[in-house]
């Protein structure tokens, strides 16, 4: 229950789904009395559920107010909480990803994932190496995201959230700049295969047409491609593990599908201010500093 309470508390927090009025004590009681099994159950709560939860909590704690004993039950707090839960259904992709409580995914990483991939339907099915295509996301964070999304239970929670009315209003096409690293060489480097450096990955990508060809290749073919014997043997041993070979093939397939979804780039010709910071100086005589 403690883990569930923390997950729901994070999910409802101001920078996540922003459910005003859902404090930790309410969450604890909702979990204790079985109203919540996971965060998606928030969107099934009714006014009667909240009132019953509070009544049971007060009886449990021996703290039934005199007004309640007299038959007067306050409901405005519950009305407000139901309204806050309903408002939270409309959210952004970055908030939703942050709210899920994925290990190592704070606000900035959630925003980066949203900005670069743009769509929950895409993100939730990507193999972990492709998350490394986002600037500042390294192997540890990418693996954590992949591990979370590989759990069937987490995917079911996402499904239930969407089924219960959560709407992500800012979906968009993936960033066309992703195309700069959607190739076999980058993928092989991102997979963190022992002894396969970016240089070796580029050699392999030049020698093999695609991931399927590499999976089927014997070690001597990798040596022919330019790899030292120890690197070739390490790669061959890595590929002998079916989980590794499957990850490579799934990642390559997802990479190709992602590349096909990229919009055309509109910034192929960089403008004169591309990548530069501009500072405007001078005065605005008619305005104060705050107005300017």
Segments and roles (model prediction):
Residues 5, 24, 44, 289-290:
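Conserved strand-to-helix beginnings and helix N-cap segments that scaffold or border functional pockets
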Residues 17-25, 32-41:
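Conserved ATP-binding/catalytic motifs of P-loop helicase motor domains
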Residues 4, 11, 53-292:
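DNA strand-break repair and replication-stress modules
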Residues 42, 47, 57-58:
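Conserved phosphate-handling catalytic cores of large alpha/beta enzymes
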Residues 27, 45-50, 128:
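Short, conserved phosphate-binding/catalytic loop or strand-edge motifs used
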Residues 1-19:
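Cys/His-rich short segments
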């Amino acid at each position: 229950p403690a883990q569930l309470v923390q997950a729901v508390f994070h999910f409802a927090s101001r920078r996540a789904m922003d459910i005003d009025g859902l404090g930790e004590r309410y969450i604890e009681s909702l979990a204790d009395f079985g109203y919540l099994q996971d965060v998606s159950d928030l969107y099934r709560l009714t006014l009667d559920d909240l009132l019953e939860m509070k009544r049971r909590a007060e009886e449990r704690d021996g703290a039934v107010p005199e007004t309640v004993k007299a038959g007067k039950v306050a409901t405005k707090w519950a009305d407000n909480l139901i309204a806050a839960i309903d408002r939270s259904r409309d959210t952004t992709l970055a908030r939703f990803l942050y709210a899920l409580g994925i290990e190592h995914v704070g606000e900035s990483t959630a925003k980066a994932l949203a900005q670069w991939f743009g769509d929950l339907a895409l993100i939730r099915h990507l193999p972990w190496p492709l998350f490394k295509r986002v600037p500042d996301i390294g192997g540890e964070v990418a693996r954590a995201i992949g591990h979370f999304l590989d759990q069937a239970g987490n995917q079911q929670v996402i499904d239930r959230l969407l089924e219960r009315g959560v709407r992500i209003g800012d979906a968009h096409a993936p960033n066309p700049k992703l195309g700069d690293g959607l190739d076999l060489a980058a993928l092989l480097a991102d997979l963190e295969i022992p002894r396969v450096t970016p240089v070796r990955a580029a050699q392999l990508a030049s020698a093999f047409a695609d991931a399927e060809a590499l999976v089927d290749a014997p070690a001597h073919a990798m040596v022919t491609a330019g790899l030292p014997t120890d690197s070739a043997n390490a790669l061959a041993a890595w590929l002998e593990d079916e989980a590794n070979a499957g990850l490579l093939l799934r990642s390559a397939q997802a990479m190709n599908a992602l590349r096909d979804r990229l919009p055309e780039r509109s910034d192929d010709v960089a403008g004169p201010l591309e990548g530069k910071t501009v500072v405007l100086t001078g005065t605005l005589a008619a305005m104060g500093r705050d107005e300017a």
